[in-house]
Amino acid sequence: MGYRSDVAYVIKFNDIETRDNFVTLMLAKNDAQLTQAINECEYGYTKDPIITFEATDVKWYSDFDDVKAHHALMHDAVEIYKEKGGKYRFISIGEDGAEECDEDDDDGDLYDYITTRHEINTAFPHIPTEDSTLTTQE
């Protein structure tokens, strides 16, 4: 079975043209893993120059080729397009609740796109008051 995580990241550029050029450049590398990673992302946003990725309940090990490709996208965005706004924010939450955050986002601009929130949701059945074992102290 193995340890599973929920992961998400956002890559942002200064403008749509730069984002689209980045996607074209990554696809032009003819690297099967990079192509698969790009195809797993959303980048058709018409008003926001971002690339997004989200996966739940996945095995996200740093030595897996697909994981390396996703991290390469984030790092290449900064390495190649830093002067054109290339930056990213990555967050994963493991099945044990452990969080990992990696980012190159000096101004905190990407925080609005991706954050974490731990919460407990319950669906306890309703107990009629007369059957309740709850006692109050006076």
Mark where each language-model region is:
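Short, extreme N-terminal segment that most often corresponds to the first beta-strand
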Residues: 1-27
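Charged interaction segments
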Residues: 23-138
